[in-house]
């Protein structure tokens, strides 16, 4: 028998039309199409002009690290908001996060909070210039670093991406109890974030709601502790053992 052919697709919503035929051909020639999220089935069918969905299955990315933050360390978290990202404005839109942060810094109720950015990329100089132009005083660029200590020490995590597949940093923030607040731009986010329990999804472009959501958490230490615990527990859905087991079941089917 012919070996099964598995295609592991990463979601890109602005795919060139010339690839649409490739989607259809790939579907016809493969035994299974593996998507990062079941929510991408409709997108794939739309790209490929397909009606049959029987070959689809979904397997998410596993968490990046073996360790999960112990609950006893949650009270030690600092008043820090974290961004871990490649500095690529087209996709990541960190400029939007900095605009939101301006609202945070000008709110007298939120004195003492800081924003740390871990990462690097071609847009870094633009972001540093934006920090200067907005006169932001509590923003630091940490460069290319192992992010674990930042996740452990930070209370909140921001993501303002235009598109993602299944973002590893979102998994990572959860496993270290760093509560994510995310612009709702990708269907897969709804499989990762349980609204109001382990994080928040905010309507894309609603800068004020993003700011108010952050403010509510910043002012409520008790709720942050509860949500941090739920974030850690929810990330265990994506342990390496569980994801490997899904792949093994698929390959042995």
Question: Where are the language model's segments positioned?
Answer:
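Carbohydrate-associated surface elements
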Residues: 39, 62
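Conserved acidic donor-binding segment of nucleotide-sugar-dependent glycosyltransferases
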Residues: 184, 194-196, 200-207, 216-221
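A short, well-ordered alpha-helix in the C-terminal region of glycosyltransferases
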Residues: 209, 216, 223-237, 249
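Membrane-proximal helix-turn-helix segments that form the acceptor-binding/catalytic region
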Residues: 13-33
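Nucleotide-activated donor-binding/catalytic signature segment of Leloir-type glycosyltransferases, i.e.
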Residues: 128-144
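A conserved mid-protein helix/loop that constitutes part of the nucleotide-sugar donor-binding site
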Residues: 79, 88-105, 122-125, 208
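Short hydrophobic beta-strand element within catalytic cores of glycosyltransferases
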Residues: 179-183
């Amino acid at each position: 028998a012919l070996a099964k052919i598995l295609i592991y697709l990463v979601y890109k919503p602005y795919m060139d039309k010339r690839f649409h035929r490739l989607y259809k051909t790939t579907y016809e020639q493969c035994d299974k199409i593996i998507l990062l999220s079941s929510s991408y089935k409709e997108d794939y069918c739309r790209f490929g002009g397909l009606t049959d969905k029987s070959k689809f299955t979904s397997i998410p990315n596993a968490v990046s690290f073996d360790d999960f933050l112990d609950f006893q360390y949650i009270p030690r978290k600092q008043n820090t908001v974290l961004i871990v990202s490649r500095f690529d404005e087209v996709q990541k839109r960190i400029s939007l996060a900095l605009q939101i942060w301006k609202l945070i810094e000008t709110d007298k109720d939120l004195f003492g909070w800081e924003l740390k950015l871990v990462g690097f990329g071609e847009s870094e100089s633009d972001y540093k210039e934006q920090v200067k132009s907005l006169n932001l005083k509590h923003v630091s660029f940490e460069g290319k670093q192992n992010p674990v200590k930042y996740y452990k020490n930070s209370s909140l995590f921001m993501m303002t991406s235009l598109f993602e597949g299944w973002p590893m940093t979102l998994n990572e923030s959860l496993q270290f109890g760093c509560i994510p607040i995310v612009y709702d731009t990708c269907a897969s986010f709804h499989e990762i974030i349980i609204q109001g329990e382990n994080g928040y999804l905010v309507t894309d472009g609603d800068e004020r709601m993003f700011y108010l959501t952050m403010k509510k958490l910043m002012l409520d230490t008790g709720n942050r502790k509860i949500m941090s615990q739920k974030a850690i527990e929810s990330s265990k859905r994506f342990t390496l053992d569980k994801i490997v087991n899904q792949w093994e079941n698929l390959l042995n089917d």
